[in-house]
């Protein structure tokens, strides 16, 4: 039952994010009214005059011109596009915070002369008696970030 609910929610979000309609609160003027002579194929394939889109909210018998000569009218974004932008913003904030936290430790290690290979060996030695067969990905990422920081700060001789 839970799986069915997730399928329905995902189908609803896909349908809402791929809608090709103009927003209801647009300030753009309506170009012309749609009469029964307009074929639905023109609206569905966007072959209509001046790339018009159907205005689905409010008075549904109107067409809004989305591409005007003065500037391009920005269509309301779908749910998936908004979610993607929000996740990218969260990721950027996290990476910025992560660098702020890691850089002081990187500076201390660089002052001690710790190389990239020594750091990797330290992680391997620490994991020997833990029961794991390899180095966890978090340790590998930390070592990779240290190596990238060494290259960025001009200490490439330590990034061996």
UniProtKB/Swiss-Prot annotation:
Cystine pairs: none
Motif interval(s): RxLR-dEER: 54-76
The keyword tRNA processing is annotated on this UniProt entry: no
Matches recorded under Pfam families: RXLR
GO cellular component: extracellular region; host cell nucleolus; host cell plasma membrane; membrane
Domain description: The RxLR-dEER motif acts to carry the protein into the host cell cytoplasm through binding to cell surface phosphatidylinositol-3-phosphate.
Task of the protein: Effector that is involved in host plant infection. Contributes to virulence during the early infection stage, by inhibiting plant defense responses induced by both PAMP-triggered immunity (PTI) and effector-triggered immunity (ETI).
Protein name: RxLR effector protein PexRD44
UniProt source species: Phytophthora infestans (strain T30-4) (Potato late blight agent)
């Amino acid at each position: 039952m839970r799986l069915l609910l997730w399928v329905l929610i995902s189908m609803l979000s896909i349908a809402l994010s791929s809608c090709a309609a103009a927003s209801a609160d647009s300030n753009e003027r309506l170009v012309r009214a749609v009469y029964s002579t307009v074929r639905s194929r023109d609206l569905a394939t966007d072959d209509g005059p001046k790339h018009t889109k159907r205005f689905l909210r409010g008075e549904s018998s109107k067409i809004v011109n989305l591409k005007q000569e003065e500037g391009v009218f920005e269509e309301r974004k779908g749910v998936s596009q908004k979610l993607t932008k929000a996740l990218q913003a969260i990721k950027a904030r996290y990476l910025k915070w992560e660098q702020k936290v890691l850089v002081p430790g990187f500076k201390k290690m660089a002052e001690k002369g710790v190389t990239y290979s020594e750091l990797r060996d330290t992680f391997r030695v620490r994991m020997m008696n833990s029961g794991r067969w390899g180095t966890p990905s978090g340790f590998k990422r930390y070592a990779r970030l240290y190596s990238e920081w060494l290259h960025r700060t001009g200490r490439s001789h330590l990034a061996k």
